[in-house]
Every structure is written in C-alpha cells, then in structure tokens.
Regions:
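Terminal low-complexity tails and localization/encapsulation signals of metabolic enzymes
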Residues: 1-14, 232, 246-250, 287
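Oxidoreductase and adenylate-handling cofactor-binding alpha/beta cores
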Residues: 182-203, 215-227, 270-277, 281
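Aromatic-enriched alpha-helical interface/lid elements that frame and gate functional surfaces
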Residues: 243-290
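Conserved Rossmann-fold dehydrogenase catalytic segment
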Residues: 139, 166-174, 197-213, 232-239, ...
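Glycine-rich beta-alpha junction loops
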Residues: 45, 136-138, 209-214, 251-253, ...
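Mid-domain beta-loop-alpha active-site segment that forms a flexible
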Residues: 175-190, 209-217, 261, 265
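Short Gly/Pro-enriched turn/cap motifs at secondary-structure boundaries
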Residues: 62, 70, 231-239, 245-246, ...
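N-terminal helix-loop segment corresponding to the beta1-alpha1 unit
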Residues: 1-188, 192-201
Length: 290
C-alpha cells in the first residue's frame, strides 16, 4: 500500500485543511485520493458540523465520531485539535502550514484573517503556500459578506430556479452544489500546484460557490444574455430532445425513462417498441415536431 501511495500523482503534497462540512473538506478529500496527505485542523469549540449529521444512523444524534456524512466527506486524513482563539493554537497551526503545500478553508470571508491565519499572515510563514478560500459568493464584490450553505448559493447561482417541475417550487439541489464547488476547488488547487512547480510561486485562490454553478447552466445564461429569455423549470423534459421524460407504465409505481437525442435513436426506438411506422409519420419526423 505504501509503495502504491508513493507513486500517486500528489505523493509528497501536504494539505492543511481548516475547512468544515462539505464544500471545503471534500475538495481536500479528492486530492487525498490522488496521494496528498491531508491534516484536518478542528477545535472542540467549533468542530466540523458534519460530525453531527446522522443520516444512515437514524434521526438520533450519532456522536462526534460516528457520523457517516463526516466519514465520507472528511475521509483519508490525519487530524489535530487546536484552539485557534488562543495564541498557542494559532502558532501550532502556523507550524503545520510551514511544512504544508496547500491550505484549504471555507469560513466566511474575514474569519481566518481575524484569527491571524489569513493569506497575508501565512505567506510570511510559507511564501509559496497555495491558499484556497471557498465561500458562498467569494471574498470580493458587492455580496462578499453574504453567508450561506448550498441551498442559498444554489439559488444565488441560478441553478435552483430552473431545477424542478413547472408547477412546483424551485429545487435547491443542496449537497450536489457543495460537491460541484469542491470539484472546482480541487481543480483550481491542481492548477496552482502546476503553476508553482513551473514558477515557484504560490497563490491565493478565491472560490465562489455560486459562480462555480455557472458550468451547469451555461446554455441558460447565454440564452438570457443573447435572447433576453428566462428559462423556467420543466422537470425531465428537454427543449429539443424528444421524447425525453419519465413516463408512467402499467402497474403500481412503475415508470420508464426515455431520452431520445437524435433521429437515428428515434428510428431505433420505434422499431424496439413495435411501431416503426412512427418514423415515417410527419408529426414525429424530427425532434422539433416530436
């Protein structure tokens, strides 16, 4: 196992992980699966909130060491408990940073600065450190002081508005957005590591979770910018691909999911269901007609 880890892409990279819950920790977890060593830094006064999430253990409080959510999101780590409100705790944290390559944190903007562990403070300890800050809407701009978790920045980023059924309220997507933010952070850290390898320079990465959602709704944004159209929720239907939905079948709670993207697929589908003549029917001749 040791030999396998030593040959991993990020072998020799150490990450000081100050982050909590999902978007921050999972970014470090993804990098740990590539071989990086991750040290999770917590405080008993402000431990990772995901430790209290039960899910598969039932509705009861699972205890700080038994949360399946924490076990998944913050897997594959070393850990240390520090009181960052005391000078001794901050100094120990800086000693960890001094021997690390990356810092990951997802506190609200300004928190790490007040603790004495902001980017400007840590580059004095480790000049080439890669410092990733992840927050709801980033550390700059008119909304920088907005705090929030996935249900909030899923709405701010626009994904919630177009997700769900037309006759129902928007669906916030919750944990899926956290994972997307974590993937964005992990990718940014990999790019920063490559940059440092070539130039010797570290950098401060400011990730806005709301902006990271843009990759999901690029077509929606372009439609609004170019055509002034605001798309709405449409369930599992698609504007062009048809048929494209979940359809009820005979029997109790029986469904079939059909997604036809091309005319060739439509021809194959009509043959498969025993109605090849539908391919010749002008009402269904192309996706726009269907």
């Amino acid at each position: 196992m040791g030999q396998e880890m030593n040959s991993s892409a990020l072998a020799g990279i150490r990450i000081a992980d100050f982050s909590q819950y999902w978007a921050g920790p999972y970014a470090a977890t993804l990098l740990s699966y590539m071989g990086a060593e991750v040290i999770k830094i917590e405080s008993m006064k402000r431990y990772d909130w995901s430790r209290t999430q039960s899910l598969t253990t039932g509705l009861r409080y699972p205890g700080l060491e038994h949360s399946p959510v924490f076990a998944e999101v913050s897997a594959n780590r070393l850990a240390v408990t520090l009181d960052l409100t005391k000078p001794e705790g901050v100094e120990l944290a800086k000693r960890i940073v001094r021997v690390s390559d990356v810092v990951v944190q997802n506190f609200s903007p300004g928190v790490m600065d007040r603790l004495g562990l902001g980017y400007e403070s840590l580059i004095e300890v480790k000049p080439d450190i890669i410092y990733l800050s992840s927050s709801a809407v980033g550390a700059t701009g008119p909304e920088w002081n907005y705090r929030g978790y996935a249900p909030l920045f899923a709405c701010q980023g626009g994904a919630a508005y177009i997700t769900g059924y037309a006759d129902e309220r928007p669906y916030p997507m919750t944990g899926r957005i956290d994972i997307l933010s974590a993937m964005t952070s992990a990718f940014a850290i990999l790019a920063a590591l490559s940059h440092r390898q070539r130039t010797g320079e570290g950098q401060h990465i400011d990730v806005s979770s709301a902006e990271s959602i843009a990759v999901l709704i690029g077509d929606v944004l372009m439609d609004y910018i170019m055509n002034s159209r605001s798309q709405t929720r449409r369930g599992n239907r698609d504007d062009i691909m048809a048929p494209h939905n979940c359809y009820r079948c005979k029997g109790d709670d029986k469904w079939v999911s059909i997604a036809i993207s091309t005319d060739e697929e439509w021809d194959a589908f009509t043959n498969a269901i025993g109605n090849p003549e539908w391919s010749e029917d002008r009402r269904f001749s192309d996706a726009y007609s269907r």
